[in-house]
């Protein structure tokens, strides 16, 4: 099976073409592909497929390294947009990418950056999903380290955002996995630890659901800026400094789309031998 290895700010992906071929992948196969010793190695696996929605150019699916499917990935959608153009699967320009019932617009640029309309954030607790009686700008969450104040935001996937004084010393390893599986988040949650440096710059670490801490998380950066803007800590746009690099996030307020701009690049292409049950077969015309 042919694959493309890509990265965005150190968040790495195995990308598969499911447009020209049908892929038959089990969770076990996905875990093997993601394994850095037995497979290719990645934080997440991305599959490009023919769209189900007539308004979309392509559909993509996202799988964590543990084999679970998730709703959205900001760094992943930038890599996918770059992959589609580089592989000749889409013409340069604005691409309409379908995932989990929503369509995201992405535009690969000549300078290596990709701008993405991530859509408006979801703030209603039931739709995040998060267990709370009413919508608030901040919530109190009981943890083993005492009550924590969080922002709860969905960017197509759920995020909890905590403000910390110093990103470097943030309790990511301790609170990340605990909050990820907190019972008030029924589908688990990504956890961001945000240091506000100025009104237009933050530093951020993210413990990703089903993955652990990663060098960067695009939806996490969007969620952090939304949470910070709702608390009047930030202006627009905001430069987000992550371990893997920098994203620029622009959000003008409730009901408006969040725009994310950042890099995406191909690292290498290759082939891997997989069990016969995971074989790819040619796909006929889709439209």
Curated annotation (Swiss-Prot):
Function statement: Catalyzes the stereoinversion of LL-2,6-diaminopimelate (L,L-DAP) to meso-diaminopimelate (meso-DAP), a precursor of L-lysine and an essential component of the bacterial peptidoglycan.
Assigned keywords, A-Z: Amino-acid biosynthesis, Cytoplasm, Isomerase, Lysine biosynthesis
Coiled coil, from the record: none
Protein source organism: Halorhodospira halophila (strain DSM 244 / SL1) (Ectothiorhodospira halophila (strain DSM 244 / SL1))
Uppermost EC category: isomerase
UniProt family annotation: Belongs to the diaminopimelate epimerase family.
PROSITE patterns in alphabetical order: DAP_EPIMERASE (PS01326)
Pathway(s) this gene product operates in, as recorded in its UniProt entry: Amino-acid biosynthesis; L-lysine biosynthesis via DAP pathway; DL-2,6-diaminopimelate from LL-2,6-diaminopimelate: step 1/1
Active site (catalytic residues): 73, 217
Locations listed in the record: Cytoplasm
Enzyme Commission number, as recorded: 5.1.1.7
Disulfide pattern: none
Pfam families: DAP_epimerase (PF01678)
Site (Could be important to modulate the pK values of the two catalytic cysteine residues): 159, 208
An annotated Gene Ontology molecular function: diaminopimelate epimerase activity
Positions bound to substrate: 11, 44, 64, 74-75, 157, 190, 208-209, 218-219
Reactions catalysed according to its record: (2S,6S)-2,6-diaminopimelate = meso-2,6-diaminopimelate
GO cellular component annotations of the record: cytosol
UniProt-recorded name of the protein: Diaminopimelate epimerase
InterPro entries: DAP_epimerase_AS, DAP_epimerase_DapF
GO biological process, one term: lysine biosynthetic process via diaminopimelate
Predominant localisation class: cytoplasm
Quaternary data: Homodimer.
């Amino acid at each position: 099976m042919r694959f493309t290895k890509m990265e965005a700010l150190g968040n790495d992906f195995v990308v598969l073409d499911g447009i020209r071929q049908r892929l038959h992948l089990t969770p076990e196969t996905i875990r093997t592909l993601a394994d850095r010793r037995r497979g290719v190695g990645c934080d997440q696996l991305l599959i490009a497929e023919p769209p189900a929605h007539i308004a979309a150019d392509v559909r993509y699916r996202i799988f964590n390294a543990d084999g679970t499917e998730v709703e959205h990935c900001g760094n992943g959608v930038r890599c996918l947009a770059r992959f589609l153009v580089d592989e000749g699967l889409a013409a340069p320009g604005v691409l309409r990418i379908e995932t989990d019932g929503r369509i995201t617009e992405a535009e690969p640029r000549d300078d290596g950056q990709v701008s993405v309309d991530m859509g408006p954030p979801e703030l209603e607790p039931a739709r995040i999903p998060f267990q709370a009686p009413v919508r608030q700008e901040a919530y109190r969450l009981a943890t083993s380290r005492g009550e924590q104040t969080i922002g709860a935001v969905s960017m197509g996937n759920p995020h909890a955002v905590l403000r910390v004084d110093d990103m470097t010393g943030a309790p990511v390893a301790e609170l990340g996995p605990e909050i990820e599986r907190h019972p008030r988040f029924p589908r688990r949650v990504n956890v961001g630890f945000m240091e506000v440096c100025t009104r237009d710059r933050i530093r951020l670490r993210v413990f990703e659901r089903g993955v652990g801490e990663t060098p960067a998380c695009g939806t996490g950066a969007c969620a952090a800026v939304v949470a910070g803007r709702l608390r009047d800590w930030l202006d627009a746009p905001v430069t987000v400094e992550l371990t893997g690099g920098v994203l620029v996030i622009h959000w003008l307020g409730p009901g408006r789309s969040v725009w994310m701009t950042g890099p995406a690049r191909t690292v290498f292409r290759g082939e891997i031998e997989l069990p016969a049950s995971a074989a790819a077969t040619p796909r006929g015309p889709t439209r």
